[in-house]
């Protein structure tokens, strides 16, 4: 059985453009009538084409497909399959973490207004942190920028989080409200995703944090008012010591007058 390009496209449910592209890539090799220039395809071509489609559905590249239907050694095919299996398993982890993120985000949106301004103690797991800016001025270190790119590929498991040093709460309203900006991820998730704990990565201790949702309804930089409620609670409770403070956006809403309100989860490490 021989097919014209139109017949093969109809049979396989693809366009003639796709078949021409696969031929150009060396994935299929139709017979060419030297007199007419017409291309004719056989069952050999349909089977090779469909094998490539299956491999593409598993997210192998066309270049990898070409190698796999060429003459790879067992070592070469093993390497390509193992690499893709590892990539898909990592994707599974990312998908699982993304689902968990969305479930948590759904609950945050449900309770947003009732938690705004409320203060509670919440236990957080150990985290990894990659810091790459002092306030909003980014560090230009090339190694750090490469790590930043790798971490950004892991969103939403990685989150953008501001960090304030412990002296901000210990010397409240003295000097500037300083912070650095970076990405954070649960330590267990980082290990599952294969992120490396390099010299740029810090470990943020888990445990109890005094927590609130703060509403920022102005466009300027963060002021001391963002910490007023937490600091008042710290003073009232008389904790033995406090650690660093972390803040990340959890929601944003546009108001009837067009102004924007951002909701920030802000937490301070406490030692009781």
Placement of each model-derived feature along the sequence:
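Basic helix-turn-helix/winged-helix DNA-binding cores
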Residues: 1-62, 237-242
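Short N-terminal secondary-structure initiator segments
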Residues: 1-21, 59-80, 134-160, 213
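Histidine- and aromatic-rich ligand-binding microenvironments
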Residues: 31-35, 56-66, 258-272
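Short, charged amphipathic alpha-helical surface segments
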Residues: 33, 50-53, 58, 65-120
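Short Asp/Glu-rich motifs
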Residues: 41-42, 74, 253
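A solvent-exposed interaction/effector surface
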Residues: 100-272
């Amino acid at each position: 059985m021989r097919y014209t390009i139109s017949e093969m496209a109809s049979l396989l449910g693809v366009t003639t453009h796709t078949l021409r592209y696969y031929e150009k890539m060396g994935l299929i090799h139709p017979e060419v009538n030297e007199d007419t220039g017409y291309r004719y395809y056989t069952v050999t071509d349909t089977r090779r084409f469909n094998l490539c489609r299956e491999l593409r559905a598993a997210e192998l590249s066309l270049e990898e497909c070409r190698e796999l239907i060429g003459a790879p050694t067992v070592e070469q095919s093993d390497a390509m399959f193992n690499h893709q299996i590892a990539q898909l398993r990592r994707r599974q982890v990312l998908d699982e973490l993304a689902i968990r993120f969305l479930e948590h985000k759904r609950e945050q949106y449900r309770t947003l207004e009732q938690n705004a301004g409320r203060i509670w103690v919440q236990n957080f797991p150990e985290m990894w942190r990659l810091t790459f800016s002092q306030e909003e001025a980014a560090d230009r270190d090339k190694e750090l920028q490469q790590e930043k790119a790798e971490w950004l590929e892991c969103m939403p498991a990685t989150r953008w989080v501001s960090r304030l040093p412990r002296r901000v709460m210990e010397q409240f309203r003295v000097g500037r409200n300083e912070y650095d900006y970076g990405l954070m991820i649960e330590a267990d998730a980082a290990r599952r995703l294969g992120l490396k704990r390099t010299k740029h990565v810090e470990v943020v201790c888990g445990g109890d944090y005094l927590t609130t949702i703060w509403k920022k309804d102005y466009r300027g930089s963060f002021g001391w008012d963002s910490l007023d409620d937490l600091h008042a609670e710290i003073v009232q409770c008389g904790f033995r010591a406090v650690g660093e403070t972390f803040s990340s956006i959890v929601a944003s809403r546009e108001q009837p007058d067009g102004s924007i309100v951002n909701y920030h989860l802000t937490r301070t490490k406490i030692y009781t």
